[in-house]
Amino acid sequence: QYGDYGYPYQQYHDYSDDGWVNLNRQGFSYQCPHGQVVVAVRSIFNKKEGSDRQWNYACMPTPQSLGEPSECWWEEINRAGMEWYQTCSNNGLVAGFQSRYFESVLDREWQFYCCRYSKRCPYSCWMTTEYPGHYGEEMDMISYNYDYYMRGATTTFSAVERDRQWKFIMCRMTDYDCEFANV
């Protein structure tokens, strides 16, 4: 299933049940190794600990056809307590996340770490269903389709539950260079 990548799904980078990248109420910065992109997002919610979540991510190398990332950057901050929609600018793919927790809002601000691959362009984009399915539930998003890449997300925020639901924006990438600055 993941033959293009040269190693099976079980060997995702740092992806295990107990390997959280943050403690509750704690900020974190997570970046995939160079040349890899985020392919899985896992999270558990804890109402008693500030209605916060612990997070874990998995990365996978992009296929050789995409080449090496030509540049990487942190996107604009998405504010705590707000609903938002963001894709990586400049046709970038998501290769990491950065987040800070705000006690006053019982929520987090978010930033995507994005990498651009030469002049490749996204197409055939779609949005996943909500993760988690209901506020407060465990979240486990795995991209089983290895020719689709995460380009961003849209989130809703519940003022009652103080939790967020995510829909991830997944796209294919062209096999050729194209001239569009941003899609």
Swiss-Prot record:
Superkingdom, taxonomy of origin: Eukaryota
Subcellular location: Secreted, Extracellular space, Extracellular matrix
Entry keyword set: Cell adhesion, Disulfide bond, Extracellular matrix, Pyrrolidone carboxylic acid, Repeat, Secreted, Sulfation
Pfam families referenced in this protein's UniProt entry, alphabetically: DERM
Sequence repeat windows: 8-61, 52-57, 62-117, 107-112, 163-168
Annotated region described as 2 X 53-55 AA tandem repeats, given as residue ranges: 8-117
Keyword set includes Signal: no
Modified positions (Sulfotyrosine) in chain numbering: Y5, Y144, Y146, Y148, Y149, Y176
GO cellular component term of the entry, any: extracellular region
The keyword Lipid biosynthesis is assigned to this record: no
Annotated disulfide bonds: C32-C59, C72-C114, C88-C115, C121-C178, C125-C171
Function text: Seems to mediate adhesion by cell surface integrin binding. May serve as a communication link between the dermal fibroblast cell surface and its extracellular matrix environment. Enhances TGFB1 activity. Inhibits cell proliferation. Accelerates collagen fibril formation, and stabilizes collagen fibrils against low-temperature dissociation.
Summary of subunit composition and partner proteins: Interacts with TGFB1, DCN and collagen.
Protein's name according to its UniProt entry: Dermatopontin
Gene name tied to this protein: DPT
